[in-house]
Amino acid sequence: MRVRIRGIYATALTYLFLKNGFEIVQQTPQIAERFFMDIIRSPADVTVKDGIDKGEIVSVGEDIYNFMRSIFKYSPIWRSPIKLYSVVSTEDCKFMNFIVEPCLSEGLVIKPPVEGKIILSSPRAVGKFAMVWKGDGRTFFSEHIDERDSQRLLSVSIPFNKKGYNVKWRSNAAMATTAELKEELENLTMRYSYNDFREQGEDFLKVTLSLEDKLFLDDIRSLVINTMKFHHMLKMTYSNEVDIEEGKVNPSPEKLLTSLIGDNMIEAIEHVKPNGKRVLLKGGTIVQKEIGRDYYWLKIRREFKSGGIYDGLNLKIEDGDYDLVELDSRNWYQIHRYHDRNNNLKGLYVNISTPPELLKNRIRYLDLEVDVVKVNNTVNIIDLEELEANKPILGEFLYKKALEIAQNIKDKLNEDKI
């Protein structure tokens, strides 16, 4: 299988795909140089790249789910139940219980239900190199196609434009021969004219990377080029600064880690659900911290006004309440200690999650949907049903890890060791 790889994880991913028998194509000059490869200008079967959020990796094309699951054992992987570029028939503005926008009776899936809804366009015939539909006879190009290639592609599509077909050339088109391009357009126009969209559609995966797997990618990248710990996490905020530090003989992430929380304020805590949805929790002031070459630990004070209850603790939120939360890059949990205005402990809530990451004035972790609470000396594991429901996305390793950590925390709380 031929794979095109782009983004901040490209070096580590290239190493892993090569070691597992994949052929890397359309390499950037930098990647070709690092791996002593010739650039292969061949069409890709699958593209692997950063998501819109740099903490995600997406793949579009052939099915590589099993491979991705084998290397990212500690990250949720969402596999779209609906293929990208498939054509679906809807009922009451829904398909497979997902809302579709716009509300078309039939449409091409141009965005899978990553956020709970499917985005459609009018039906199109889609192939490896192009997509075709009836229109005003125009040609469009992927943003990844340069002007030199676009002239050749335009010469191929103009005859089809004259017949009233719109053609959009995909990035793979620049790697195909003229004969291959003509053959695909002929096939696509025929399929479109017969409304035959049965065979089209591409797998879409989204990996929401945990800190654990980012550190794994750091280790893999270090086999190819000088790489310090937290490289990929830091790359989400910094670019040149990371490169400059790694250009030193003995690079250290300490300075960059410290600069992420320079004013000792955390604006928000990003609580990321297994499906990738982000819930922003109230931030606060850093009251204690330790930052080293290979770890960081923070204690944050979060203050509250009255109104509502503490989820999981079933206690009222009152004026003057505050939370002292501890976050440690070495731990798979965060400890929340809720106090009243007189500094009396109201309850303790331990959120089971992947180790927390530092972004610019923010904390991010991946919630594992199970927590442990202690109120009035009674300890309970809560939300086990949520963990079970998310097992397919979390995968076996992460699911078992969450159960193991939750039980361990429960035991420690019962023994007053936390």
UniProtKB/Swiss-Prot annotation:
Coiled-coil annotated residue ranges, if any: none
Domain of life, per lineage: Archaea
GO process terms (BP): rRNA processing
Top enzyme category: hydrolase
UniProt lineage: Archaea, Thermoproteota, Thermoprotei, Sulfolobales, Sulfolobaceae
UniProt keyword NADP present: no
Reported function: Probable RNase involved in rRNA stability through maturation and/or degradation of precursor rRNAs. Binds to RNA in loop regions with AU-rich sequences.
Gene Ontology molecular function terms on file: mRNA 3'-UTR AU-rich region binding; RNA endonuclease activity, producing 5'-phosphomonoesters
Annotated EC: 3.1.26.-
InterPro entries xref list: DUF402 (IPR007295), FomD-like_sf (IPR035930), Ntdp-like (IPR050212), RNA-bd_FAU-1 (IPR016730)
Keywords: Endonuclease, Hydrolase, Nuclease, RNA-binding, rRNA processing
Key word Transmembrane helix present: no
Protein name stated in the entry: Probable ribonuclease FAU-1
Gene: fau-1
Annotated family: Belongs to the FAU-1 family.
